[in-house]
A protein has these predicted regions:
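ATP-binding glycine-rich loop module of kinase domains
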Residues: 7-35
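Short beta-strand micro-motifs within the conserved protein kinase catalytic domain, predominantly
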Residues: 54-66
C-alpha cells in the first residue's frame, strides 16, 4: 500500500501507511527534537488512561529525513465533525473540554514542566532585553 498524505506543514508531513501513521520531518530538522517528541509520547503512553497512538518506530528515511511511525487511529477530526453536524457543535466542544480536563488530571513526573520550557525559550530570545524578559 502506498503512503497517503494526511497533513503537511513547513516542517513535516504526515502519511497514512496501512494501519500506521508516519510523520516525516523535513531535511535538517533537529534530531534532538524528533527524539524528544518520541520520548514525550512514550512517557505519556506509559501513564495510561490517555488514548494516544503508540510509537512503533523512530527512523531515518531513504532521503535522510527523520520519521516517527505510530499506530493509526481511525476517525474524524473535530473540525470535520463540526462541519458535518453543526447542530452538535456545543456537544463536541464539551467533549473537548472534558478530554482536556482528563488530560490535565494525569501526572507524568518525567515530563518537563511547560513553565520551565517557556522560561528557557524566553531567556534565549536575543530580541528581548533583560527587563522585558523579566516582565
Amino acid at each position: 500500500m502506498a503512503r497517503e498524505l494526511i497533513s503537511k506543514n513547513a516542517t513535516k508531513s504526515v502519511y497514512r501507511d496501512g494501519d500506521k501513521a508516519v510523520k516525516v520531518f523535513c531535511k535538517g530538522f533537529p534530531k534532538a527534537e524528533v527524539l524528544n517528541e518520541a520520548l514525550i509520547s512514550a512517557r505519556v503512553e506509559a501513564i495510561g488512561g490517555i488514548n494516544i497512538p503508540s510509537i512503533q518506530a523512530v527512523s531515518v528515511e531513504e532521503d535522510g529525513c527523520w520519521s516517527i511511525t505510530r499506530d493509526y487511529i481511525e476517525g474524524k477530526t473535530l473540525t470535520e465533525l463540526m462541519k458535518e453536524n453543526p447542530d452538535k457543535r456545543d456537544e463536541y466542544l464539551n467533549q473537548m473540554v472534558e478530554l482536556q480536563l482528563m488530560i490535565h488530571s494525569k501526572t507524568c513526573p518525567l515530563l518537563n514542566k511547560l513553565k520551565d520550557k517557556m522560561a528557557r525559550q524566553i531567556s534565549e530570545m536575543e530580541e528581548l532585553d533583560s527587563v522585558n524578559r523579566y516582565d
